[in-house]
Regions:
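Amphipathic, charged alpha-helical scaffolds that flank and support histidine-based chemistry
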Residues: 95-111
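Short, charged, amphipathic alpha-helical segments
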Residues: 52-55, 81-86, 107-112
Length: 123
């Protein structure tokens, strides 16, 4: 088995065996990683690479945010669940704007907020 397949199998096993609260942290970690890659794309000189890297990583982050939102238990989550749903919608809208206009500051803003949520979940 080559290294890529081993890493993929390891990740699948880690996700399948993780506690629900750890899955949330893993999703936040993925969003943080993708947003970091999108921010670094602003250093690319090739316009195609610049646009493709930003678009790809923002859409991956949006997919994570939508999954986090979908997983919320709004019936039992109370005010916290409602607040998270509002934040996730805000993040999704801001990232859509960042993707259309290629605005680094918006990506940095969302990255900062998601990092704060990740740190709170990890405590």
């Amino acid at each position: 088995m080559d290294s890529a397949k081993k890493l993929s199998a390891y990740r699948v096993n880690a996700v399948n065996s993780a506690a629900p609260e750890n899955l949330v942290v893993m999703l936040y970690d993925g969003a943080i990683r993708f947003l970091g890659t999108a921010i670094r794309a602003f250093e690319h000189e090739d316009p195609l690479d610049f646009n493709l890297t930003i678009h790809t990583n923002i859409t991956k982050t949006q997919a994570i945010i939508r999954e986090l939102n979908h997983a919320l238990d709004l019936e039992n989550g109370g005010e916290l669940g409602q607040n998270l749903a509002g934040l996730y919608l805000y993040f999704d809208n801001r990232l859509q704007e960042a993707n259309i206009n290629k605005e680094k500051a918006i990506i940095e803003e969302v990255l900062e907020r998601i990092s704060e949520l990740r740190d709170a979940w990890n405590e």
